[in-house]
Amino acid sequence: MRASQFIIEALDSDAVNELDLYIMNNEDLYRRRFMPIITNIRRKIKRNIYDHNKVIKMWMYLVDDAAREYVKEFGSKDQDVKDVFPKETRLQVAQVIADRELENIKQGEYDAPKGTVS
């Protein structure tokens, strides 16, 4: 491998981590996109129709919204989402979130105790 390939991979890794952190720390995205996806996934698991490959598409709606908001908040006026976060990077973020949140759901992270208001 060439040195430039290592640099590109490191940059992509940083972009993936940056966008993932932005998503996990944005209250509006959490309420508007994240929790409805979690609810949908829990419903699909309960009905035994969960398909991990199809769930990536659901997470992409969240990731695309987050990428647009990130560029709007931190980017310059001439930057485009596709330049800052290419589709491969956004897909990788969706995959990371899908894997992590499936594990969290299986561990009962989003199960509300009986008698609580959610």
Q: Predicted regions span which residues?
A:
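Acidic interaction surfaces
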Residues: R2-S118
